[in-house]
Design a protein with these regions (language model features):
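Positions that flank functional sites
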Residues: 71, 94-95, 262, 308, ...
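Short N-terminal helix-initiation segments at or just after the protein's N-terminus
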Residues: 2-7, 25-31, 50, 260-267
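Glycine-rich, acidic/polar active-site loops that bind/position phosphate-bearing ligands
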Residues: 144-302, 311-425
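Short, surface-exposed, charged/polar-biased interaction segments
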Residues: 84, 100, 108, 136-139, ...
């Protein structure tokens, strides 16, 4: 055993950083090149098809078959120009990672020729084998079929020579077999409830989106040892640079990188995005991390608690509610009216955490998380809301001073005093 370890250490010392050639010095020159974003849709779609797709994305309207055919043709043309040969419905089963079933654009004809085919029916639905994935008891053993259904709110992207189409994953009976469908339902419910409240303050608000900014922690270990290593700082930087380049090609706005507490533990973070897209990007990031690490003779450890006695890795996220008019509903305002709106959402968020802590905890329950939570590191195993001293005192004052259940003009005037300050950490 010791000779194997020494041999691995010797091999590790001989390894050099692998440099990846990144074209140009401006990220803006290649950011999102492998993503079928809205500006690219405009290039490949008719005005009518583009408008109908935007209506589907923005309002949830059903998309007709003709429009789906137009979108499929546009995706095929764009992706084939970039060297793509296959497409896949990219989904998020109950495994904590993603899954794919690849199909070729290539279709043989009866006269011996062939063509590339991709139409609306192939875009909208696929049928992977649901028996290959956990179901939580929602799928009968004799109902092996599962269905993936296109999620138009998250843009398609290219990995290698494959066009990846974000989808939900459901059973033969229509039950969710993934993490995306419950998320989309929750986002719709929050939008509906928050928009109704916002209408009391601003009639121009017709949509509230949940925004999400996540962090991904990970351990990076040399593949020849996997559990021990000498210093590899130069190689880590080369790995990070290539990983960020590959992420930017996929439209993932990674902006932050730094060391974490444990030896050879690191963290990355992107700019916040709409929550469904941010969730997709986090799933995609883990795959990019794995593939890039192997090119640099590393192994990525994404497990929440890979080492005993050493702090683990986690996904910390910062979420908010944003209206279509650009207002962050969880940010204190600058006048009594906007502060009253902030307080409305603020106190209801705290109440929701208090009343639904068990459901919130259950939604993040995994074996890995159970190993980590409460083990002398953040976060603890309880669900709590830390408000900071300033906001706590403000709520105490409101509770003490407003006795009749209604706010006097003086109470409303007081709302403009100091609430706009940042809560203390």
């Amino acid at each position: 055993m010791s000779s194997t370890r020494f041999q691995a250490l010797s091999e590790l010392h001989e390894r050099k950083a692998i440099r990846n050639e990144i074209p140009g010095n401006r990220v803006s020159e290649y950011f999102g090149n492998n993503v079928f974003y809205y500006h690219k849709m405009r290039e490949y779609l008719t005005d009518d098809a583009y408008d109908k797709l935007m209506e589907c994305i923005n309002t949830g309207a059903r998309i007709d078959r003709q429009t789906a055919d137009h979108v499929a043709a546009a995706m095929k043309e764009w992706s084939i120009q970039k060297g793509v040969t296959h497409y896949t419905h990219w989904f998020q089963p109950l495994t904590g990672t993603t899954a794919e079933k690849h199909d070729s654009f290539f279709k043989p004809l009866t006269d011996g020729r062939a063509l590339e085919k991709f139409d609306g029916s192939m875009l909208v639905q696929q049928e992977p084998d649901a028996s290959s994935f956990p179901s939580g008891g929602l799928r009968n053993t004799f109902e092996a079929r599962g269905y993936t259904l296109w999620d138009p709110t998250s843009p398609a992207f290219i990995v290698g020579n494959t066009l990846c189409i974000p989808t939900i994953f459901i059973s033969y009976t229509g039950h969710a077999l993934d993490y995306k469908m419950p998320l989309l339902k929750a986002l719709h419910a929050v939008d509906h409830a928050a928009t109704a409240v916002c209408q009391y303050f601003d009639k121009d608000v017709n949509k509230v989106a949940v925004t999400l900014g996540w962090e991904q922690e990970y351990f990076l270990i040399d593949s020849s040892l996997h559990n021990a290593r000498p210093d590899i700082a130069e190689r880590v930087m080369a790995f990070m640079q290539e990983f960020e380049y590959e992420s930017h090609l996929l439209g993932i706005p990674v902006t932050t990188r730094h060391n974490e507490v444990a030896p050879n533990q690191f963290e990355l973070a992107p700019m916040f995005e709409e929550a469904n897209l941010a969730n997709d990007h986090n799933q995609l990031v883990m795959d990019v991390l794995e593939k890039t690490a192997r090119k640099h003779n590393f192994r990525i450890l994404l497990h929440e608690k890979p080492f005993e006695g050493v702090n683990g890795s986690g996904k910390h996220n910062n979420w908010a509610l944003s209206t279509n008019t650009g207002v962050n509903l969880l940010k204190p305002g600058k006048n009594p009216k906007t502060n009253l709106q902030f307080l409305t959402f603020f106190v209801n968020t705290v109440a929701a955490i208090h009343e639904n802590a068990d459901v919130l905890r259950a939604s993040i329950a995994t074996v890995g998380n159970d190993h980590r939570l409460g083990a002398n590191e953040a976060p603890p195993a309880i669900m709590s809301a830390f408000l900071g001293g300033h906001l706590s005192r403000m709520l105490d004052d409101l509770e003490k001073n407003i006795k009749a259940g209604k706010m006097t003009p003086e109470d409303k005037t007081d709302l403009k005093l100091n609430i706009g300050k940042l809560p203390q950490a």
